[in-house]
From Swiss-Prot:
Signal peptide start-end: none
UniProt-listed InterPro entries: Flu_NS2
Motif (Nuclear export signal): 12-21, 85-94
Main location: virion
Gene Ontology CC: one annotated term: virion component
Protein location: Virion; Host nucleus
Protein name, entry field: Nuclear export protein
GO biological process, any: exit of virus from host cell nucleus through nuclear pore
Gene3D superfamilies from the UniProt entry: 1.10.287.230, S15/NS1, RNA-binding
Miscellaneous: Average number present in a viral particle is estimated to be 130-200 molecules.
Complex formation: Interacts with protein M1. May interact with host nucleoporin RAB/HRB and exportin XPO1/CRM1.
Family according to the record: Belongs to the influenza viruses NEP family.
SUPFAM superfamilies: Nonstructural protein ns2, Nep, M1-binding domain (SSF101156)
Length: 121
């Protein structure tokens, strides 16, 4: 994984954790948790691709990896919609910048996961 992507994830997670969104802080914590989960999943797919012979290991370890991949794409789509919604309703420039960067990162990660998954198929 690209070191810029790692720092982008860490930066966005740190910024999101500092936001005070009042009653929606539970929702934000859920988004942060999903971001972290997505990062770990993307990293594990990337490592599997780097080892290329690891496809059989990946399949035997998790016979439902295609189903899991589909679920991750659903999570990404949900996060994209949630981030877009937050972007529309927030008035704080700090939050707008953070959510714009989060949206860009989600789109990049979605593309990376697609690329990794095509290499594994």
């Amino acid at each position: 994984m690209d070191s810029n992507t790692v720092s982008s994830f860490q930066d966005i997670l740190m910024r999101m954790s500092k936001m005070q969104l009042g009653s929606s802080s539970e929702d934000l914590n859920g988004m942060i948790t999903q971001f972290e989960s997505l990062k770990l999943y993307r990293d594990s797919l990337g490592e599997a691709v780097m080892r290329m012979g690891d496809l059989h290991s990946l399949q035997s370890r998790n016979g439902k990896w295609r189903e899991q991949l589909s679920q991750k794409f659903e999570e990404i789509r949900w996060l994209i919609e949630e981030v877009r919604h937050r972007l529309k309703i927030t008035e704080s420039s700090f939050e707008q910048i953070t959510f714009m960067q989060a949206l860009q990162l989600l789109l990049e990660v979605e593309q990376e996961i697609r690329t990794f998954s095509f290499q594994l198929i």
